[in-house]
A protein has these predicted regions:
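Alpha/beta-hydrolase-fold enzymes
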Residues: 14, 19-106
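Short alpha-helix in the alpha/beta-hydrolase fold that links the catalytic acid
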Residues: 134, 148-158
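Short beta-strand/loop motif that positions the catalytic acidic residue
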Residues: 132, 138-140, 144
Length: 204
């Protein structure tokens, strides 16, 4: 914990799921947490029963489970026009420059095993809502294509039922935003950043 008077967590996507699970298992480790597009569920264009069947089958075959999940693959620079992460052309190009300068930062698509573990982590988050009363701000992207916004809504509903609602009682929706809220256009990004700073200040 260290000598600091106050401790805060700011986490995004899978980092949000991991941070939430951490606080459910180890109480009172921070004074407040702000989450942007936490991965409590994954957008997959197939029925849940089919996804589970495929993932459970893949889990039993090591070569398959460690391979890229369907529809994904090695890292490649996608044209800005088809990206589903940000509307900011400038920030998107900056990220591509980072990857060009440091190829080791490039991360390809998820493996079958990673997808399965991600889904299980989201389920654990929802099951453990009653174990954490840390003040929580959950920020949601309106035009989300990566994580399942329905799970954000469910998480906030469960927290409210457990007696420690999310800030505002529901997710703070950033209108028009894609998944990478803090890499978005300034107009959207500033709404999220201001909300985070104000939230942390209230718990200072």
């Amino acid at each position: 914990p260290g000598p600091w008077r106050k401790r805060y967590i700011l986490a995004h996507s899978m980092g949000g799921a991991i941070s939430t699970l951490f606080l459910q298992r180890y109480e009172h480790q921070c004074d407040a947490i702000a989450l942007t597009a936490p991965m409590y569920g994954i957008v997959i264009r197939f029925p849940d029963w089919m996804v589970r069947h495929i993932l459970d089958w893949a889990e039993g075959h090591q070569r398959i489970r460690e391979g890229y999940a369907i529809g994904t693959g090695r890292w490649r620079a996608l044209p800005f026009a088809i990206n589903v992460l940000t509307h900011s052309r400038q920030r998107y190009r900056r990220n591509l420059r980072f990857y060009a300068d440091e190829p080791r930062l490039r991360v390809g698509g998820p493996t079958w095993h990673w997808v399965r573990e991600g889904i299980l982590a989201g389920e654990q988050v929802l099951a453990g809502v009653g174990d954490d009363d840390t003040p929580t701000l959950l920020i949601q992207a309106e035009e989300e294509r990566v994580v399942d916004n329905r799970m954000h809504d469910r998480y906030c509903e469960l927290r409210a039922a457990a007696g420690h609602p999310c800030e505002g009682g529901k997710p703070l929706v950033i209108n028009g935003a894609y998944h990478e809220i803090l890499f978005e256009k300034d107009a959207m990004r500033s709404v999220a950043l201001n909300a985070i700073v104000e939230f942390f200040n209230r718990h200072n």
